[in-house]
């Protein structure tokens, strides 16, 4: 019987700032039970020393029968979502999701936008701010967010800056907490989220949805582990769906993503602009949009987890990035 290790950080309600991206205990428990029902052994590990010890001690001749589900998000480091993929690749152990290189790259929103722009993907102008400057290069109003955070960390309604006075009041505080900052034009349209499942050259796009929030801004104040405070609207015009599907498939291919990613867009005059790519999306049935997009397609949560595991094993068999680790296991 094959074994799935859920390598995870577990959300701490007493420290929401640092653990906002982490999965809840309820989600980890649901994933455990669901994967176990698929016929796998399941082990959940949330201590870094224990994770590295267990992985290092998997018998070298049996590592192809283990797979690590990457749910470690960490904090502050620009490499934090790559810890598990890098360790697994080095040790020659299968893992779910994208490689360490994709994880590091997509966590840097500014570099990702520069790359996507160079590949012909529509993105807004942007600038990276590492220290205070008297005014942005982009015209007001602008939207300001941390360059390397997820789950809307560091984002509130005050991140929309209308004029010079608000800039001078807001930017020093944000730089102190979340440097560097990404500065973008404020887009007035609706947000859209797109899920892409699969490995290179075999991607599928999930049902596409608008993400609506009470204030119109997707910020940390509406993130919850107990309920979904946003709403998904799947009534997206066919022409827009086709454009987003084509663009999202290109993005997945350009990045070389594996397993699953979520891509977020925002409209301006009904034209979609890519905001960011999340290579480690959540898998909660309560608060994670990827799982909701999947279930909208008429398939079950267990089918989603099974597919993600199968894609991880498939990647292990076919992708050359594992070769060094495999050779050490002989």
Name the predicted role of every residue range.
Residues 237-330:
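ATP-dependent carboxylate activation and anion-phosphoryl transfer catalytic cores
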Residues 164-243, 249, 267, 271-273:
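Phosphate-binding site of ATP-dependent enzymes
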Residues 1-94, 101, 105-107, 311, ...:
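ATP-binding N-terminal substructure of ATP-dependent carboxylate-amine bond-forming enzymes
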Residues 2-8, 58-62, 104-182, 188:
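Active-site nucleotide/adenylate-binding loops and adjacent lid/helix of ATP-dependent enzymes
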């Amino acid at each position: 019987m094959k074994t799935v290790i859920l390598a995870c950080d577990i959300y701490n309600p007493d420290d929401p700032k640092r653990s906002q991206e982490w999965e809840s205990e309820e989600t980890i428990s649901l994933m455990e039970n669901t994967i176990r029902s698929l016929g796998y052994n399941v082990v959940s590990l949330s201590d870094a020393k224990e994770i590295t010890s267990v992985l290092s001690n998997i018998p070298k001749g049996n590592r192809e029968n283990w797979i690590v589900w990457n749910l470690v998000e960490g904090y502050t480091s620009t490499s934090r979502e790559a810890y598990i993929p890098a360790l697994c690749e080095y040790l020659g152990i299968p893992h779910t999701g994208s490689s360490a290189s994709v994880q590091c790259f997509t966590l840097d929103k500014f570099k990702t936008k520069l790359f996507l722009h160079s590949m012909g993907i529509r993105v807004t102008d942007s600038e990276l701010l590492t220290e205070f400057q008297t005014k942005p290069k982009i015209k007001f109003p602008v939207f300001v967010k941390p360059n390397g955070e997820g789950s809307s960390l560091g984002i509130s309604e005050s991140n929309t800056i209308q004029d010079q006075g608000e800039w001078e009041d807001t930017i020093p505080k944000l730089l102190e907490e979340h440097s560097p900052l990404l500065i973008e034009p404020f887009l007035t349209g609706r947000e859209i989220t797109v899920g892409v499942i699969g490995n290179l050259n075999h991607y599928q796009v999930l049902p596409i949805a608008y993400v609506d929030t009470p204030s119109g801004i997707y910020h940390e104040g509406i993130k919850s582990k107990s309920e979904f405070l946003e709403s998904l609207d799947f009534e997206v015009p066919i022409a827009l769906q086709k454009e987003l599907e084509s663009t999202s498939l290109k993005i997945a291919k350009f990045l070389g993503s594996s397993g699953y990613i979520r891509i977020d867009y925002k409209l301006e005059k009904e034209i979609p602009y890519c905001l960011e790519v999340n290579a480690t999306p959540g898998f909660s049935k309560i608060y994670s949009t990827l799982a909701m997009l999947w279930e909208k397609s008429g398939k079950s949560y267990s089918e989603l987890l099974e597919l993600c595991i199968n894609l991880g094993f498939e990647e292990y068999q076919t992708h050359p990035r594992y070769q060094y680790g495999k050779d050490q296991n002989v």
